[in-house]
Amino acid sequence: MEVHGKPKASPSCSSPTRDSSGVPVSKELLTAGSDGRGGIWDRLLINSQPKSRKTSTLQTVRIERSPLLDQVQTFLPQMARANEKLRKEMAAAPPGRFNIENIDGPHSKVIQMDVALFEMNQSDSKEVDSSEESSQDSSENSSESEDEDDSIPSEVTIDNIKLPNSEGGKGKIEVLDSPASKKKK
């Protein structure tokens, strides 16, 4: 401890030494609580001696080759060849041959699929679960007729369609511009 620039000895500490900046450093305080291992001084130093890194060495292990990776690597060149073949055919063919809206001609076999995609909310998923349970119960009871089960309609119409969030009230439909309104004018 210093008073007005003069060092004063304390009974519990050894005489302080000065580091390169002129600040007194007590070796006892720096090694306190270390049990002779260097104390806080070694913990604060970035380049302190490493603890035993030799005992905890990491090992590199070779991973087996994935069969999925093999399949992908054989598929990608086939896909590239097919794309190149299609580009060449498109360049040599008449303009309307590869039009997906033109289904006339040799490729007239077309399967049309109408798919609706919507997000179900929590109440919808509970109703689906209950309808699945009721359909399982009805399949177990052979005495009930299938006409009474309205949970699985055969055709979607305006009367039986269920739109998400339709419980909150009716939506507002506003026609801004239509061919019928143009004919009236």
From Swiss-Prot:
One of its GO terms (cellular component) is nucleus. Client-loading PAQosome/R2TP complex cofactor that selects NOP58 to promote box C/D small nucleolar ribonucleoprotein (snoRNP) assembly. Acts as a bridge between NOP58 and the R2TP complex via RUVBL1:RUVBL2. Keywords: Chaperone, Nucleus, Phosphoprotein. It is found in: Nucleus. One of its GO terms (molecular function) is box C/D methylation guide snoRNP complex binding. Residues 143-152 have a biased composition (Acidic residues). This is NOP protein chaperone 1. Interacts with NOP58, RUVBL1 and RUVBL2; the interactions are direct and NOPCHAP1 bridges the association of NOP58 with RUVBL1:RUVBL2 even in absence of snoRNAs. The interactions with RUVBL1 and RUVBL2 are disrupted upon ATP binding. GO terms for biological process: box C/D snoRNP assembly. Its main location: nucleus. Residues 10-21 have a biased composition (Low complexity). The lineage of its organism: Eukaryota, Metazoa, Chordata, Craniata, Vertebrata. Residues 1-40, 118-185 are annotated as: Disordered. Transmembrane segments: none annotated.
